[in-house]
Amino acid sequence: MLVIDAHVHLFPDEVVCARESCLEGEPCFAELFGDPAARMASAEQLVAGLDADGVAAAVTCAFPWRDLGRARAHNDCILAAAAAHPGRLVPLAAVDPLAPGAAAEAER
């Protein structure tokens, strides 16, 4: 049976390494990932986990950051991860629809 994980998050290294700096002004991120024990994965860690668990592919979801610059960087991260792991990681970009410039980021 083909197993696909339909909702995973992977994060840019700068978010994984400096999680605390991303908490202010980002209540959703703080709620889900503010606890240092909350697991965050890079693309390489995610693919290794897929391999270990026999999962064929995963839909990698960006995070709906309020800060549009951070959202762009995260979208870039998941697009690059998908390009590096074709057929394994399927990107799903995210943007806060109320953020100024959100439409341009969504179209990109």
What does each of the following model-derived ranges do?
Residues M1-R108:
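Helix-coil boundary/capping segments in enzymes
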